[in-house]
Amino acid sequence: MQSLIKGINQRVFMNNGINYKLGEVCEIRSGYSGNQLLSKKGLKVSRIETISGHKVNLERVGYVAPFESSENYKLQVGDILFSNINSVEYIGNTAFIDKDYDLYHGMNLLRLTPNNMVVIPFYLYLLLNTNRMLNRFKTVCNKAVSQASINQTELGKTVVQIPDINAQKQICELYQALYDKLESEKYANSLFQKQKQYLLRQMFI
């Protein structure tokens, strides 16, 4: 299944479309930079490690005290978190906000809010994860000794090719079907492994 996704990945995004700068199809914002709490109390905020697995992991968030403009930082369904400060290998890591996580946008990640009139948020998320885009991020990032970074302005200049909405919908539906099948296979494999371990334990009782 993964090889199938990789194969489709290289083809479906080569369709004709209109060239935009990324900053023209989404709002790009930096996160809240207030001090984080040592205790797990207050508002949950995203951190680099929150999206290290390419999806939101609520076990790896930070916490901050409530602040006046907090609602401006609350992540909404359709937002995309983008890792712009990381090692070169992980620069450009993203996570799609697919539901309300009651999570706020923290520092060291950029928040991309797509313009729904131009691009379907999930389509933009998929596009940012193509090899072509990931290789570009690795090429244009500023490389230091221990980490790399892409500033907000440079990211906004990234050229993306956006087809019409109907084409975007078809691609999103295809990928969603593939993702659902992958998750189903992972779950089935997990159940199989648990059953196998249980049977092995029973043999030695």
Where are the regions a protein language model picked out?
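Sequence-specific dsDNA recognition surfaces
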Residues: 23-35, 49-80
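Acidic/polar-enriched heptad-repeat coiled-coil alpha-helices
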Residues: 172-173, 180, 187
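A short beta-sheet element
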Residues: 47-48, 67-129
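A short glycine-rich beta-alpha junction/loop motif
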Residues: 103-109, 119, 142-166
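Non-catalytic DNA-recognition/assembly elements of restriction-modification systems
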Residues: 3, 7-32, 157, 161-167, ...
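Short, surface-exposed secondary-structure boundary micro-motifs
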Residues: 86, 174-176
